[in-house]
């Protein structure tokens, strides 16, 4: 049974405020105008602030002489009633603007305004002016209440200070936390920039199934579901890889997909059960070209969205401009563990002794490749601050990657690490159907041995490879982690609009 967390109870004073607001809504219902829907907005606060930013040019007289009138709507964020005249501030998706309200101009609407609450959504029409303090203001000639807010917003000085409440009530967080809105605006721009970059290079965006008969494309535990009409168990996809490579077989030589993946794993500052990935495949490319592509798309996206390639992330200053370092996994392990020799890197017994010395817990089924990876993750990964490609992973931990022509037991694979976090994974794709079938069989044996993240045997994918897949390079970039990097966010929950949370009671 899912553990439930008690829902936070509003304080008594908040309950009384809600009751007061409900009474106001009741009065509006009595007038038959509770939630009007006949207002069409024509202007945005941010656009006006930008257009009339120069106070020396746009003096009060110049604004009045311009004859400019505006028609706006937004959430009431502040109000100051001073008798015959009042000030208010409204917020829309683009920013905020001040309203100057006069009783002798607005009449009954001004009287009604005095009873409105912060959080209400209002519409305003009027000309533009500038106050003595230089603030651009809308001199209202008409004012309406569009939506009555029943719940008070958090205190403006403290905002939504409870982090868990911010994630659960993202709708409130977005209202009161400008920094949160900016993160998600940047997220949208990042994805849009990456799409434009790929489209300009003849990549074709495609959509592949979210529900799979056989889970595959990554070593991960899947979520299961059931199709009632067909009486068929299905799996939410852990990766789109095998479907995308089927498309390469079919002649779509440059394809990509930006979409959700689902993995039935733990939750942390770096992991969410559902997450967004960019996955792409390019025929006639090796993992060297895919590393070049990875480096360039990340660098160009940063420049496009941020205007710089220098970012700060979780206490580290990252420079995306220089060429990213490329470092073999076994060499990185030996560099950080001088006790491990070159011969040890492929010697299972030797690696077992090193794991014991390093207090790394392992399973009896692990071969030398998995042991080498465990040592890398424990002793090297967290040290990789500046962008670094770790290359040439063991076959054992790379069931879909092409084997190296020169290094038996290794593959033409890379992972990109920045500030100790994996952002991308790619390789020259395995297109030998017999080798792929043998690796699937090894994964099945691992699953039978208790590895619930091991892959299933996908006979249809083997059949596709038997028609012939050209030499191909592939890449997966974690969009959520890339957004974390480019926005300086330290938790994946800060870049997901609605992160996974235990349900409230």
From Swiss-Prot:
InterPro entries: Aa-tRNA-synt_II, aa-tRNA-synth_II, aa-tRNA-synth_II/BPL/LPL, Lys-tRNA-ligase_II, Lys-tRNA-ligase_II_N, Lys-tRNA-synth_II_C, NA-bd_OB-fold, NA-bd_OB_tRNA. It catalyses: tRNA(Lys) + L-lysine + ATP = L-lysyl-tRNA(Lys) + AMP + diphosphate. It holds the Pfam family tRNA_anti-codon. Binds 3 Mg(2+) ions per subunit. Transmembrane segments: none annotated. The lineage of its organism: Bacteria, Pseudomonadati, Pseudomonadota, Gammaproteobacteria, Lysobacterales. GO terms for biological process: lysyl-tRNA aminoacylation. Its EC number is 6.1.1.6. Mg(2+) 2 binds at residue 422. This is Lysine--tRNA ligase. Belongs to the class-II aminoacyl-tRNA synthetase family. Homodimer. Keywords: Aminoacyl-tRNA synthetase, ATP-binding, Cytoplasm, Ligase, Magnesium, Metal-binding, Nucleotide-binding, Protein biosynthesis.
